[in-house]
Amino acid sequence: MAFFEGNNMTGGYGKGPNIINSCSLNVERGEIVSILGPNGAGKSTAMKAMLGLLNLKSGSVVIEDQDISKFSPQERVQRGISFVPQTKNVFSELTVRENLEIGGFLRKDDIDIVINQIYELFPILAEKRDQVVGQLSGGQRQQVALGRALMIQPSVLMLDEPTAGVSPIVMDELFEHIVKVKKTGVAIIMVEQNAKQALSISDRGYVLVTGENKFEGSGKELLNDPEVRRSFLGA
């Protein structure tokens, strides 16, 4: 059994149709797993199901052999699962440090220790700690979002389109930071449209089509799979 997994998840929003159908995903600690696929494939929905943001009609979500399918999103955060949404993931009117402090609101210990660890991972945040986040570049704001999510020292980090809207150079830099986070032992699941680049840093990947598992394998296997390349990588 993997460290964190969603098993045969089926569900949608409210009373609407199912968006994911018998979808299964898993990740180990110290691993990056990418969820890929065309628009409308259910990628973000699968992630949100694992976060408890929609009710599953069937299937389960398990972390460290504990079934958390009935846990609320807040309880899942307390269990060590952190999430960076694609948009509205920082407080633009607050400083870098204030954003990190908000990310650590669940902590009972001295958050300065954790903040300093975040500064070591993301040196630019230390440099700009007193700057208002709304004045930062897109890539720097994403680093703030990552840092804030890491303030609970999660065992699982879920990222929804972390490189959306940034330049190729900034995308490469963000992926380098994500790899650094992985090396601390965090299990990382990310939804990405930049499939080639995501697979190049991923230990494993899943390709979803209409909410179902279509392909899965190591990042290298998926990059080299002719059908995956033709259908999803534009090659």
Feature annotation, model-predicted:
Residues 2-235:
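Glycine-rich phosphate-binding loops of nucleotide-dependent enzymes
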